[in-house]
Design a protein with these regions (language model features):
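Metal-dependent enolase-superfamily TIM-barrel catalytic cores that perform enediolate-based chemistry
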Residues: 135-174
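Short glycine-/small-residue-rich flexible loop motifs, especially phosphate/cofactor-binding loops
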Residues: 47, 123, 163
Length: 174
């Protein structure tokens, strides 16, 4: 069985964060997206950037602006990041991102806030190691087909028309 050789350092480089930045982003959708919760015209999210030694990694928080679908919101995530997780992270010197969940365990819940910061650290780690993020996470490569979510449509005919449009646009999963 062929096993890929990985370049290994003689000792892991300690990672100590020097900067954390959280940005609020609002991206307009190509068309309104309607669900039983209402109609969305843009997607709001938080983008977390972490830097160390001139390298930056980014993580996205997928919470919404309201708590109607998920318990965490952009505002609660911002609060937990600013007042708890970022101060914890600044006090750490870690050899690998796998150490973060244990460090964050004292903060109960708030998994989206933790995931956004942890993913940013994972990307920073991958960039420092000079490997794609999927490899740093243990992935094997290859392609993954993307899909599209259509949302509610006024009629079955309108729904079928949208499905046909998306399939024609190249989506294999609708």
């Amino acid at each position: 069985m062929h096993r890929p050789r990985l370049a290994r350092r003689s000792a892991p480089l300690a990672l100590k964060l020097q900067r954390v930045e959280v940005r609020h982003v609002a991206l307009p959708l190509r068309r309104p997206f309607e669900t039983s919760f209402g109609t969305t015209t843009h997607k709001e999210f938080l983008l977390v950037g972490v830097s160390a030694e001139g390298v930056t990694g980014y993580g996205e928080c997928v919470a919404d602006f309201d708590p109607y679908y998920l318990p965490e919101t952009n505002q609660t995530v911002l609060h937990i990041l600013r007042d708890f997780l970022v101060p914890l992270a600044f006090g750490l010197e870690i050899a690998h991102p796998r150490e973060l969940p244990a460090a964050f365990a004292r903060v109960r819940g708030h998994e989206m806030a933790k995931a956004a910061l942890e993913m940013a650290v994972w990307e920073l780690h991958a960039r420092r190691e000079g490997v794609p993020l999927y490899k740093a996470l243990g992935g094997r490569g290859g392609t993954i087909p993307t899909g599209v979510s259509i949302g509610l449509q006024p009629t079955t005919g309108a729904l079928m028309e949208r499905v046909e449009e998306e399939v024609a646009a190249g989506y294999r999963r609708v």
